Amino acid sequence: SLLBFKBMIEST
């Protein structure tokens, strides 16, 4: 899912 993808990338 895109949301999961974004969350994974922006995992600060």
UniProtKB/Swiss-Prot annotation:
One of its GO terms (cellular component) is extracellular region. GO terms for molecular function: phospholipase A2 activity. It is found in: Secreted. It is an enzyme of class 3 (hydrolase). Its cofactor is Ca(2+). One of its GO terms (biological process) is lipid catabolic process. It comes from the Eukaryota. Expressed by the venom gland. The keyword Kinase does not apply. Keywords: Calcium, Hydrolase, Lipid degradation, Lipid metabolism, Secreted. Binds 1 Ca(2+) ion. It catalyses: a 1,2-diacyl-sn-glycero-3-phosphocholine + H2O = a 1-acyl-sn-glycero-3-phosphocholine + a fatty acid + H(+). Its EC number is 3.1.1.4. Belongs to the phospholipase A2 family. Group I subfamily. PLA2 catalyzes the calcium-dependent hydrolysis of the 2-acyl groups in 3-sn-phosphoglycerides. This is Phospholipase A2 1.
